[in-house]
UniProtKB/Swiss-Prot annotation:
Name the UniProt record assigns to this protein: Type III pantothenate kinase
Residues given in the record as K(+) binding sites: D129
Main location (coarse class): cytoplasm
Cofactor(s) required for function per UniProt: NH4(+); K(+)
InterPro entries: ATPase_NBD, Type_III_PanK
Top-rank taxon: Bacteria
Binding site for ATP: D6, C7, G8, N9, T10, N11, T12, V13, T132
Organism: Roseobacter denitrificans (strain ATCC 33942 / OCh 114)
């Protein structure tokens, strides 16, 4: 069975797959100090709680936090006796081309999303991922990754407002009932929510104009459903896009061994 690990700046997700069949998933905070033994105890406890007695034979890792990769490698080797595939490393092949100035600088999560998007929707895509950063990744007609845009994440923007202005409280993001807020919280929520609606729409329109073609816009990430319901910003929402991409990359590497 395959264990796919998606390590982001905020959270790390572990998912079990039996071929293309999803089995289970768990989420924990990303902490670079966490040891291989701690990963195993945490994962084993959750598997036992769900009465999952399975043999993990393969591991694939995508990590935007380089410092955690070493301990995840040790975790895979020590407890599952397997050498994990790590997206972005030379021995992990991708089924799509990367056509940018510095391919090694592209975040692994963005490459994985490109693979997943092309597998599910074909080419000519703009992949919008609402994570710690809000990223826009452009997928060419043949599935190649050809660049993108990085903007501050929604929650990061809210936190920056709270940290930088003493009078502004910490608030959660939600769709406001009106654009004009009548209290501080509503004003902040309106500014961030509608500001990001405008940001997404403008960036996507400029990408389409620059590439002189119609492109489908696919959203993913924790806050994507909140924006998915707003003014037809996206052509589709895909939950667990990164995990799907990891399974595609794993299968591709197995087939090319």
């Amino acid at each position: 069975m395959l264990l796919a690990i998606d390590c982001g700046n905020t959270n790390t997700v572990f998912s079990l797959w039996d071929g293309t069949r999803f089995v289970a998933t768990w989420r924990t905070s990303t902490e670079w100090q966490r040891t291989a033994d701690q990963y195993y105890v945490w994962l084993r406890t959750l598997m036992q709680f769900q009465k999952l007695e399975v043999e993990i034979t393969d591991v694939i890792i995508s990590s935007t936090v380089p410092r955690v990769v070493f301990n995840l490698r040790v975790f895979a080797d020590r407890y599952f006796n397997t050498r994990p595939l790590v997206v972005g490393k030379p021995d992990c092949l991708l089924p799509v081309d990367v056509r940018v100035d510095e391919g090694t600088q592209v975040g692994p999560d963005r490459l994985v999303n490109t693979v997943a998007g092309f597998d599910l929707f074909g080419g000519d895509l703009i992949m919008v991922d609402f994570g710690t950063a809000t990223t826009f990744d452009v997928v060419d007609t043949d599935g190649a990754y050809v660049g993108g845009v990085i903007a501050p994440g929604v929650n990061l923007s809210l936190e920056a407002l709270h940290q930088a202005a003493a009078a502004l409280p910490h608030v959660d993001i939600t769709k406001p009932q009106s654009v004009v807020g009548t209290n501080t919280v509503a004003c902040m929520q309106s500014g961030v929510f509608w500001g990001y609606v405008g940001l997404v729409r403008e960036i996507c329109e400029r990408i389409k104009a620059e590439r002189a073609r119609d492109m489908r816009v696919i959203s993913t990430g924790g806050l994507a459903p909140l924006f998915q319901q707003t003014e037809a910003l996206f052509d589709a929402y895909q939950e667990d896009l990164t995990m799907h991409g990891l399974t595609v990359i794993y299968k591709y590497n197995k087939e090319t061994e």
